[in-house]
């Protein structure tokens, strides 16, 4: 006698326990019931492009091409045959080796700061960097107790002294030493252009009117510390003392994270980098060694002298080349080690020596901050770069450096012929991303053709994908997004209740990982399905 069970709907059938009895329909004895499936999957990535632009593209729109890896993984699913030829399942898929690489040589900078693209048949021309000459920006260094006390004690030139010299000085001229201290030790100009009237008379720097007076943490914690009065007068010793103490407190509260030696080294390195292409034309060697963080007082002094000599040699090389007053003024930095540092350096204690090094380095940084001689040299060098003869020499030098780099690269290749192919490939490529993905989907399948032992089926699915891994060799936060898929496969009846599914599928991601990459894999899988 035939057993007939009516199925109210496909979804209600999914609620049947996996131990439910099979459903026999018709003379063929076709069974409906739960099944489990396990398999392996592999494929390729489609629809993903590099986030990096191709520097050879003049319009700046083309992205670099990627070399993609072949993702692989496994699948695990549970489902139900809900009607003859129709199945519904819930499955999980894990994919790894979702990788992409860009050729390392596609984006690189050569020794003269040129960014270029690898050429194919000589079609891609190098993109040359335009050398911009801008003096290093001033860096405000912490004001030490010794420098603070020195500033407080700076006297004004008295009215009597100016009268005895037949000079009638105003208050600012009498306070010239104090104004110089503000510039050299605090990096502040006493007078600046009026922002409301740039062509009008200069006004007292508003910064000076906003410097809290005295200790930033006064005893008793008053609600607010006083600022200099609106009628601030630099020759007034009481107001000057409060200003210096306030500046020293603020400079130490907002001091740079790097040590004074590191700040000095970076400034000198920038200057050397700025002038190197012109020094090469003049045949002047530019040192490539920076100050160590543990530089001694003597090393700092020698570095400042080296900088002075190099700038003067460069100026002298081009003196008279442009005519006029260009390169006419000698470079004399005249770095003098602070007296306080000299006294500290004479001690034998390590702490005293470290303090002396910091004091000397800070003094050197202050000397370079807004240095008029260096600023004028930069202006002259900017004019020099526009000269036709110098332009031609720069192009010739760049071409020579390109040739040297090419020859060096060929020599390196010959030396590396003994290395393994795998190692070579590793050096030729640069990872763009390396990801793994866990996908959970609900899928519906329908047979489109059935024979005694084989059936061809199609299916659709939707679900969520969780992606993690690295982009540009940096770990990313896990990304979750919607996905949809379509599949076409063949089911082979290998034994009673056992089927082998060979399936091809495509999965589409609706969102981008890190707003850069849309991972759309094209996959092939082999699974074993067992009907209970």
UniProtKB/Swiss-Prot annotation:
Keywords: Cell membrane, Membrane, Signal, Transmembrane, Transmembrane helix, Virulence. It is found in: Cell membrane. Residues 1-22 form the signal peptide. The keyword RNA-binding does not apply. The keyword Protein biosynthesis does not apply. May be an adherent factor for rickettsial adsorption to the host-cell surface and a determinant of virulence of individual rickettsial strain. It is the major outer membrane protein. It is a multi-pass membrane protein. The chain crosses the membrane at residues 67-87, 480-500. It comes from Orientia tsutsugamushi. Residues 401-428 are annotated as: Disordered. One of its GO terms (cellular component) is plasma membrane. It holds the Pfam family TSA. This is 56 kDa type-specific antigen.
